[in-house]
Structures are given as structure tokens and as C-alpha cells.
Amino acid sequence: MLPEKVVKILEEMKNEKIRGASWMAKKGAEAFILLSEELDETSLEEGIIELKREILEINPSMASLYNLAMFIPITNDREVVKLRAEEFIKRAEEAKKEIASIGAQLIDSGDVIITHSYSSAVFEILKTAKRRGKQFKVILTESAPDYEGLYLAKALQDESIEVEIITDAQLGLFAKDATLAIVGADTVTKDGYVVNKAGTYLLAISCYESEVPFYVAAETYKFHQKITSKEVELVERPLYREGSRVRNVLFDITPWKFIRGIITELGIILPPRDMI
């Protein structure tokens, strides 16, 4: 049985509706740190196996959780577990800073950038561009049904970035007004497809039709080396409106052909030439 403090983190991860894969991975790493502090050497290995299983069950297709689970060794050495989890968090933070710097170079003053949902990587890119003196506007969706787009809007306004909030249904209408699109990612599959908040695929298609460059910001620990786009399990959460059940699949899958590039801490990954 996992310690109560660890179970509390797992419940927080399961119930989170606003923050995405980066936050989930960090909380998961914190759970491993707590586990190393709460269990002794005689029960640590068993605890690690159980915690890995619990984390992977939260979202079986989320690469950040899979890669975190693979990064932590099964050992009875408490210090090793703690150091590995801390190293994961450190690398993740460094990756996001590098992505912010690389992504900000894509933005010019006068740009109109469109995005969907909340991505901490996208926020850092926009914040960095603003702090480099660039003036631009961001069009963003409210991102129903959890409305995490409003969370992003507030964060951008706190950075004195001009925002325009639209309903999700207007993605196609407003995409043509943008000069650049940047979204985050929960997972990049083995075959290069992007799993992200439902609506991302629609935005990508709209940008493709309007010839608006569509970029994805994703740390390399969000790349899944095992699953392909056809093997992704799309999580659905119960949703009811006025007594009626509403389908609420949380994610969709965007093919490579609609993506101009994926911004990573190692640089921008471009699609295969036959997809350009």
C-alpha cells in the first residue's frame, strides 16, 4: 500500500483539469521523492512498482508519465530514487527554458498568434517573446468544458500581452486572422502525430487551409518511443448538460502533414520532406 502523502498526489493528478503533461510529470516525480522518504529499504522496490502502475493508469498514452516511469529505477536505494526524480524535474525545467528561447525566435512584432487550451511551454514562449520587446496579440480559445484557455488568458494579461478570447466553435473563423499558431502537446507518438487537447486537430486543419504556420511546443520527454497514433488511448471524462450525457473525449490526434515543426529543447523538428 502506498503512503497517504503519495496517494494524495495521485488523486491530485487524476482530478487535475487545467494543467497538462508537464505539470503531471513534475507531480509524478514529486510522488517518487515522497515515496523514497516515506518507505524504508525493505518495502521501497514494491512501492516503486505500485507507484509506476498507478501513474501509468492515469493516462496510458501520456508520454511524460511513461518516460518518468521508465526514468525511475526499481531499487531499494532511497537516495538513488530521490536523486533520479530530482534529476527528471531539473531536466524538465531546463528543457522548458530552452523551448521558450527557441520558440520566441519565431515571433515577430505585429504577429497575431492563435493557440488552444493551456500549455506551460506555449506560455513560456509567449512570455519570453514579450520580455524581448516584441509586441503581438494572442487569439485563444476558452477551451471548454474546463475552460483552461481562460487560465492562460489571465497569465498572458499579467504579462501585459494583448489577448482575444474566442469560443472553441470559432477556431476556423479566426484562424485566418492569425500569422502563427503555437500549441502544446501531451504526447508525440512514435510516428510523429501529436496528441493534445481536443480541438487541436481542428485548429491545425484551419491553419493549413489558411496557410498559417502551425507549430507544436513539446519537450523531448513528451515523445513516446513505443506507441503509434493508432495505439493511442483517448481518455474520455463523464460530462452532463441539463440531464443529458455529452461526449467528452479529452484529446485528439493531429497528423504530421498539418504541422510546420515541433519546437523542442534540442531545436525545431521538421516534418519529412514528402509531407511539406
From Swiss-Prot:
Keyword Protein biosynthesis in record: yes
A molecular function (GO) term: translation initiation factor activity
Pfam families hit by this protein: IF-2B (PF01008)
SUPFAM superfamilies, per database record: NagB/RpiA/CoA transferase-like
Family annotation (InterPro entries): eIF2B_alpha/beta/delta (IPR051501), IF-2B-related (IPR000649), IF_2B-like_C (IPR042529), M1Pi_N (IPR027363), NagB/RpiA_transferase-like (IPR037171)
Keywords, ordered alphabetically: Initiation factor, Protein biosynthesis
Superkingdom of the source species: Archaea
NCBIfam families, sorted: PRK08335.1
Chain's role: Catalyzes the exchange of initiation factor 2-bound GDP for GTP.
Subunit structure: Complex of two different subunits.
Family in the record: Belongs to the eIF-2B alpha/beta/delta subunits family.
Protein name: Putative translation initiation factor eIF-2B subunit 2-like
Lineage: Archaea, Methanobacteriati, Methanobacteriota, Thermococci, Thermococcales
